[in-house]
């Protein structure tokens, strides 16, 4: 609001003017010669007055002159509207007077269109905002001195122009904020309905099979007309390795994802009466353990009987279908001749028959006690049978014999001899092969001479090998032969030693075996990354080698922790070694290249890189002189911030973003927006200079750092950005206002 027209300042300035007018009027009223009718000579704009006994002509108010020959209009407005009428006015001169009018946006305090300030009337500001709807739909009116401005209300954005605006001169209008469709969350979905107006919220949830750590699941529509970036990160549920079950082993392949089923079978000697044992991966990322357990089986051996004089048969009552059971058969024999010693031996038998039977190599004319029980870990109540073998004709000797196997690689030869203590010679021919090694062959041949009636020969056989053993009785008219097959089990001792890694992905080890004997090795490799939960690499393969010191190089991914299980197929015992591969250069940035010549640089679009070769640590935007592009090394660490840059010839880091701060879709980075990105200032480009803008991706893990770079843009003869020009314009306007203020203050 302005001050009244008769403030102290203007009144002091009018005082000399009034004194001057008084002097002029006094001069016009001087008396004339005696006898002259002075009043008749007064000017038409003068008045005759009687003063001190004399008549004088005085110009009327608003005129100046001698009152008789001259009374001219006095232009009161020549001293300025502010001095005459007051602030926010325009002065209008009239014959013999003047009147004042308030400027647009102001009104006179006497509520008339014109006024004379001598009654105290002055101009006061009009509050245009009292008129509703002045700024149209969505607009908010703000009163100013002599005018008003329009701004958009909360929930609205200006369209077709900036704020503030004037509805009569500007095309700007206010439109309701509409954020549109909310952003998508990978592997997530929006819960319920939503609106897209200011302040609206949408809630996200992970789809089945995925979960998120406790984070904000809400995205809001902001005043910028965009949705907040969702912070929900859905990760696939992975329950890891299934739990161990007492007296059970895990069988088959299983999935660690939601709904994956791990299946177990009970160990030898145990069973699950309630059914199959399974464990299921739940939505909590944990395994739901089975309520069923493996209980010990107590095998009952019934109905033991003798047949063919030396063969024994029995029955079992196991509830399992086709149970493969190992038996221990203890034999104790006493010849009818009390002078002969007691003979004891043990025979092992493995079979899945419910009515097992075994033929024993027994002496004739001997009392035997046979004890049958199951081998550990299976338990049973032992069964016992006693019997006597029949006598034979000592003169009968046809050279026939039979063979029984015990302790896996030992043979017992039983021949009816004409004479106790007679010498016999046997020829052994042994040939071993492995089904999984086409070139493997173990052959040996030897003679064995003995005087024992039931000699025992233990063979030196390789594990996990199928052997054919042919035994021929020499020095016999009929040269009787017996052929048997032996399948040796895997070795119970370790056959691999001194395993070590070299060249990051290669292994070497020492094989404990006979020289030049081919062996097959089974590899099971499992790779994981702590920084990439969804990553899982599993490999299974085998190799064959006859070397005592085999070596193999593996096809491993960079930046990964591996567990390698190595087992020789001839052994049951694997060895496990851990390997860690170092990271390599991250994938090249996916950028859209720009070349700009004397124009503003468009916003650069940053896309998130995939963590293929190691964890992504950060993204950097580097601004270099164009001349340095050909010599720039991506691995260089010399680039500094803009303010610590020693010379214009050096490059600087304009922005640095941590990988976790880069959205999954993309984000835009305007070059030269005068903002800080991390610790780095994004400075405007210098006018008239040539620049090269580079995007650098950094991967860091295990104290190793790798980079990859891509040229984002080339800027030649750079001009000021729109943002810079706006800043300069506002700065210039501020200077003009300050100088004008100082000029008025000095008056």
UniProtKB/Swiss-Prot annotation:
Gene3D superfamilies: Complement Module, domain 1 (2.10.70.10), Laminin (2.10.25.10). Residues 743-747 are cytoplasmic. Residues 1-29 form the signal peptide. The chain crosses the membrane at residues 722-742. GO terms for cellular component: membrane. Residues 35-72, 73-112, 125-162 form the EGF-like domain. Glycans are attached at residues 87, 112, 193, 253, 348, 367, 563. GO terms for molecular function: calcium ion binding. Residues 177-236, 237-296 form the Sushi domain. Its main location: membrane. It holds the Pfam family Fn3_PTPRU. CDD domains: CCP (cd00033), EGF_CA (cd00054). Residues 30-721 are extracellular. InterPro entries: EGF-like_Ca-bd_dom, EGF-like_dom, EGF-type_Asp/Asn_hydroxyl_site, EGF_Ca-bd_CS, Growth_fac_rcpt_cys_sf, NOTCH1_EGF-like, R-tyr_protein_phosphatases, Sushi/SCR/CCP_sf. It is found in: Membrane. Disulfide bonds join 39-48, 42-57, 59-71, 77-91, 85-100, 129-141, 135-150, 179-221, 206-234, 239-281, 266-294. The keyword Lipid biosynthesis does not apply. Keywords: Calcium, Disulfide bond, EGF-like domain, Glycoprotein, Membrane, Repeat, Signal, Sushi, Transmembrane, Transmembrane helix. It is a single-pass type I membrane protein. This is Sushi domain-containing protein 1. It comes from Homo sapiens (Human).
